[in-house]
Amino acid sequence: MVNKNINDIPPILCCSNIIKRYQYSNFSITVLDGITMSIEYNKIIAIIGASGSGKSTLLHIMGGLDKPTSGDVFLEGRALNKLSDKDCSIMRNTSIGFIYQFHHLLPDFSVLENIAMPLLIKGLKFAIAKHKAQFILELIGLNNLCDRYPCELSGGESQRVAVARAIINNPPLVLADEPTGNLDESNSNNVFKLLEKINLWYGTTFVIATHDLSLAKKCHKIYIVSNGMLKISTI
């Protein structure tokens, strides 16, 4: 058996000449203008840029939540933007986790039920989903929050629960849009440390859109989005 060199392993995510243009009645706005990039497995990547620079739009296109005007997005070799809505939805639920600035936890469900929700959507029985959710909570040190509801959590606790929900399906890729943007410095550090642990334990790839330069500097690589263009930061 021939051992593959790490350089022979294809990237988990590729964006090829991504253009995103919004067309209005008598004018158009180009938000992304020819973005090409590759994301390696097992990395934590930051995408930084000013508000309105297009970093969130890029993240949504990477996750199949939006389609580019032209260009392609490949996730583990499959062109996301060429999939049917149904197939894209299935791939998102099995291969991609999402974390947002606001946790979007369902208020009428407990922490355990919120974390188990992606598994229930996937069709797993509640007993199995509950067991896996309990395991994740114990793994990240939040098992004491199991029966609480979102209204009973602090901001930092809510966001760590959102992280747990994002990894419950063990996706190879997690996309995080300003995951610490609503938190103070202490809670921001705690959330990022959790992402680092998950990256180390599971080899999960994280792509984080953020305006927090101190957070970005902790990542393996930083990309800058400016005027619709992308470049690698040397910060």
From Swiss-Prot:
- The ABC transporter domain is annotated at 13-235
Q: Which gene encodes it?
A: lolD
The terms under GO molecular function for this entry are: ATP binding; ATP hydrolysis activity
Q: What family does the database annotate?
A: Belongs to the ABC transporter superfamily. Lipoprotein translocase (TC 3.A.1.125) family.
**Which positions carry the signal peptide feature in this UniProt record?**
none
Source taxon at top rank: Bacteria
Binding of ATP: at which residues? G49, A50, S51, G52, S53, G54, K55, S56
Q: Where in the cell is it found?
A: Cell inner membrane
The record describes the protein's role as: Part of the ABC transporter complex LolCDE involved in the translocation of mature outer membrane-directed lipoproteins, from the inner membrane to the periplasmic chaperone, LolA. Responsible for the formation of the LolA-lipoprotein complex in an ATP-dependent manner.
Keyword annotations of the record = ATP-binding, Cell inner membrane, Cell membrane, Membrane, Nucleotide-binding, Translocase, Transport
Look up and give the membrane topology term. Peripheral membrane protein
Report one GO cellular component: plasma membrane
Q: How does it assemble?
A: The complex is composed of two ATP-binding proteins (LolD) and two transmembrane proteins (LolC and LolE).
The kind of enzyme this is, by top-level EC class, is translocase
What Enzyme Commission number(s) apply to this enzyme? 7.6.2.-
Q: What is this protein called?
A: Lipoprotein-releasing system ATP-binding protein LolD
